[in-house]
């Protein structure tokens, strides 16, 4: 039996102003299992970013249940959500979100220094250098992000996301700021990580990269739909 990483049931998200209500998510039901590589596709405004924000505990749903490893997280305080996020979730962003004032090494070490359970400097060094080696960037440890190419910065962002050994890796348009060559290289790296056991959930607008996932979700108007056809025999299309 597959091990469930997260479960969503009846998740809704409503953004309200004095003039109107916007229903960004409408009754999302979703399970992600250990070892999955899930892609989330859909047009602008369909709810992809909102869903990813809730998955990553950057926002909370208006209604519904969300469990990570059987822990209900849909109504956590900001402090509790931050703790779970740092312990169980890794992020890779389109814009890299690296800190230019810090070296590559310190960018990757930063999440470890904020963990609830302290780590020794020796342990931090071992984890950081292991992650840098995994993305073939150990030789850049002392450089700063602005000394690197876009493709290299995204590799560093991947290493930072892996440093806490997260249960779930959330990936937001990882190739959006890269040319096709570097985009393909980053996607090959993500696919390799998945084959090694990392669980990924990725938002992408590129159908080629979406087809690299083992499961595809299609969002429209805040609901998960299924496409008519799919050409990748290794990918399961979810129908809701």
Task: Indicate where each model-derived feature is located.
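H-loop (His-switch) and adjacent beta-strand-loop-beta switch element
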Residues: 216-229
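ABC-family P-loop ATPase nucleotide-binding domain
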Residues: 1-14, 228-240
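ABC family nucleotide-binding domain
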Residues: 3-219
């Amino acid at each position: 039996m597959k091990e469930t990483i997260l479960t969503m049931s009846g998740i809704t998200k409503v953004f309200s102003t004095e003039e109107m209500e916007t229903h960004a998510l409408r009754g999302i039901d979703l399970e992600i299992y250990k070892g999955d590589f899930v892609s989330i596709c859909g047009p602008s405004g369909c709810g992809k970013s909102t869903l990813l924000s809730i998955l990553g505990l950057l926002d909370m749903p208006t209604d519904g249940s969300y469990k990570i490893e059987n822990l209900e997280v849909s109504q956590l305080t900001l402090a509790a959500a931050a703790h779970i996020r740092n312990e169980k979730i890794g992020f890779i962003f389109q814009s890299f979100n690296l800190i230019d004032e810090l070296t590559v090494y310190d960018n990757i070490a930063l999440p470890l220094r904020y963990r609830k359970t302290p780590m020794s400097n020796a342990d931090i060094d071992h984890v950081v250098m292991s992650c840098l080696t995994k993305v073939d960037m150990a030789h850049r440890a002392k450089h700063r992000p602005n000394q690197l190419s876009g493709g290299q910065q995204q590799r560093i962002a991947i290493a930072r996301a892996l440093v806490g050994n997260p249960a779930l890796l959330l990936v937001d348009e990882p190739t959006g700021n890269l040319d096709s060559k570097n985009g393909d290289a980053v996607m090959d790296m993500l696919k390799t990580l998945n084959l090694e056991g990392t669980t990924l959930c990725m938002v992408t607008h590129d159908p080629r990269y979406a087809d690299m996932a083992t499961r595809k979700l299609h969002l429209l108007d805040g609901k998960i739909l299924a496409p008519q056809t799919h050409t990748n025999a290794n990918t399961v299309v979810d129908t809701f």
